[in-house]
Amino acid sequence: MAGNVKKSSGAGGGSGSGGSGSGGLIGLMKDAFQPHHHHHHHLSPHPPGTVDKKMVEKCWKLMDKVVRLCQNPKLALKNSPPYILDLLPDTYQHLRTILSRYEGKMETLGENEYFRVFMENLMKKTKQTISLFKEGKERMYEENSQPRRNLTKLSLIFSHMLAELKGIFPSGLFQGDTFRITKADAAEFWRKAFGEKTIVPWKSFRQALHEVHPISSGLEAMALKSTIDLTCNDYISVFEFDIFTRLFQPWSSLLRNWNSLAVTHPGYMAFLTYDEVKARLQKFIHKPGSYIFRLSCTRLGQWAIGYVTADGNILQTIPHNKPLFQALIDGFREGFYLFPDGRNQNPDLTGLCEPTPQDHIKVTQEQYELYCEMGSTFQLCKICAENDKDVKIEPCGHLMCTSCLTSWQESEGQGCPFCRCEIKGTEPIVVDPFDPRGSGSLLRQGAEGAPSPNYDDDDDERADDTLFMMKELAGAKVERPPSPFSMAPQASLPPVPPRLDLLPQRVCVPSSASALGTASKAASGSLHKDKPLPVPPTLRDLPPPPPPDRPYSVGAESRPQRRPLPCTPGDCPSRDKLPPVPSSRLGDSWLPRPIPKVPVSAPSSSDPWTGRELTNRHSLPFSLPSQMEPRPDVPRLGSTFSLDTSMSMNSSPLVGPECDHPKIKPSSSANAIYSLAARPLPVPKLPPGEQCEGEEDTEYMTPSSRPLRPLDTSQSSRACDCDQQIDSCTYEAMYNIQSQAPSITESSTFGEGNLAAAHANTGPEESENEDDGYDVPKPPVPAVLARRTLSDISNASSSFGWLSLDGDPTTNVTEGSQVPERPPKPFPRRINSERKAGSCQQGSGPAASAATASPQLSSEIENLMSQGYSYQDIQKALVIAQNNIEMAKNILREFVSISSPAHVAT
């Protein structure tokens, strides 16, 4: 029976697999009267504090037995998540890491409340799995039998347990008492109710939640428990709570959202896997618009929506930066999510769209003065320097504009662009301009980023078949008013790193003018302010396809560094002007941005780029150690993304759901499940996402929550397609040239002519990669570059960095430190480089002709080159200064440092 998993390990009170129902009920009653004491006696025969190495090793033996049973060829397990033959070895490996970290301190580990509960539950679940094989016998080998379904459920539970263990013991060290809940108000609730506890009995949790979000009945409580208790152990951990509050955000209407989306919605599927979603939707293959949704098992805290397209394909996608109800409403309006589980009546979720109170960021006088000195304002997004900040990343609290966040995520950006912390949620914010008269307000003070004490994992996975319970509850459902407990807590804010990279022209902008510009931006940005969560740009006027020589890139491998190739003089806006005030923040998000420079970095094993594929498989930890360090003193990444490309990706139906080639997990005991790299590439004609039917893990690459619209072959989508193709092959061409010639890293003469030629060479790749412009384009020559090893990526990351930073091929990539872990800035920084003037003689189009237009300019250029500046740097400075030679000299002095001592004389 589908509910057996829960009955024996969850709702039944956690009595052993042979425990009686009355024993479990007594245990639950004791919980109710002893809210802060845990009933370990009914979880395991071990008394509290007896988790020792011997018990762990006994558990390992049970896990090994389960693995051997599951390796039976007759079982023919599918190599897709949740894959028990990966999960148990990974769990074993992480437990070994934990034990090694607590070598000699086993008593401390054994007394850890969370670890005790986890080990007891792991022991119980492995025994339960072994019993399943004994009782199921030959039926275990029938793919659609009930015992086999129960095995899939247990696999999901093991998957949740591993994710939770990695979340509470990252790197093997306990951090449950400092775990960051994503949603601020949810974090405040947990802190007030449970302090620094990592795990609490279900009864204690239910009582505390009931005080804030009233639970109407025992039936509702049971259904709620089956949703929150992902590991089915009668406890709620801070990790599980975080997942639940992310899934059913916003907090103010948490249980109302849960009732509407999980209890009464026919499209909700509890504990379903990627393959099971496909199998279920196969019944409605001739009914386009049929859809169901489930919790992603590989990315806890996010939803996965499966749906049938007009041309009979089954796709699955993950919505980003918006609650599920908003994604379902948007998908219904666009014609994708019409028939939940094939039913003709689609629930109306618009009642959930009450405007959520926006977090107001108050600018302090100190910040106001600091930004005025730099010719900027606090509310201006520091990535694009065009739009106002209107979204806060959770849990780290950094601020930016929606356009930049959307572009970053669609371009495979891993984590927060400022600090690389995992993005587990977003909240709309309003930055209130500094008011000298009303500076005493106690609203949240503004800063570049606010590390909030919260962390959110929107993950609610049905711990097992509670279908009957849900149906019963749905029949007696009562609409609940929004909870008054909805105000976000205050949070301390980090210091703002000063922006010393602004040009003199911006520095001298009067603060009043700056404030006026910001006011107009705020007005233009008011489009978002009334939405529950920021949404990506919608289908609007797409930019025309870029010219072939435009060096913006969509290459996935370049994304974690977030450094686009430099603007050519023809398409780069003059940097001595203030960025244009957009008429619409969304509509103008594709405008070219000023391209800055940053220090180049040497290859590093901890380079965030080298870890890209590591983040694709298991949900925790999501970041490498180097990515987790906030490093406020490190210069931010030196450029903006190509937002014109991002806009096209974001708004076009071509940005389909899970549409990336699978990634090979580089290192883990669990290799089999991630060996789908040989899966054939998508046919060019297929919309993106349709090739994603191999496994759920492609969810990680989902660039947009927008589902594919197969019926729409409008001109805008074709324009987007072209935009994506050209940009992706631009990166590929440059990477190929850079990879094939090691000497290029010191003295390449890669100019626009080479770039155009590179485009021509990569033509055949365009159609192959148009469906998913986010994976690394496979170059025709040499083929081995299409799938590089981590060491290849590490070696190439920084060497490609200089290509994408400033287009100066003479930069010596062996100089420089670690990869900057900061987001791009709108203007260039100093860059240390060794330049050979002779290698830069080939001009680049318009700038070259402009620079040589007058004899005076020519002589000045020769003079500057004799001082050690490269020809390309002089070109750029002249473009920025609009051929004002004095201004160009100032720019060169300020932003270009060279090894030649001649530079000192200038």
Swiss-Prot record:
EC class (word): transferase
Chain spans, region Required for ubiquitination of SPRED2: 358-906
Record note on what altering residue 229 to Q does: Abolishes interaction with ZAP70
Region (Interaction with CD2AP): 648-906
Chief localisation class: cytoplasm
Bias type Gly residues, positions: 10-21
Start-end of Polar residues biased regions: 639-653
Example of a GO MF term: calcium ion binding
Chain positions covered by the region annotation 4H: 47-175
Modified residues (Phosphoserine): 439, 452, 483, 619, 642, 668-669, 900
Residues with Phosphotyrosine modification: 371, 674, 700, 731, 774
Xref: PROSITE patterns: CBL_PTB (PS51506), UBA (PS50030), ZF_RING_1 (PS00518), ZF_RING_2 (PS50089)
Posttranslational mods: Phosphorylated on tyrosine residues by ALK, EGFR, SYK, FYN and ZAP70. Phosphorylated on tyrosine residues in response to FLT1 and KIT signaling. Phosphorylated on tyrosine residues by INSR and FGR. Phosphorylated on several tyrosine residues by constitutively activated FGFR3. Not phosphorylated at Tyr-731 by FGFR3. Phosphorylated on tyrosine residues by activated CSF1R, PDGFRA and PDGFRB. Phosphorylated on tyrosine residues by HCK. Ubiquitinated, leading to its degradation via the proteasome. Ubiquitination is negatively regulated by IFT20.
Biased composition (Pro residues): 533-550
GO CC terms: cilium; cytosol; flotillin complex; focal adhesion; Golgi apparatus; growth cone; membrane raft; perinuclear region of cytoplasm
Domain notes: The RING-type zinc finger domain mediates binding to an E2 ubiquitin-conjugating enzyme.
Listed name of the protein: E3 ubiquitin-protein ligase CBL
Species the sequence originates in: Homo sapiens (Human)
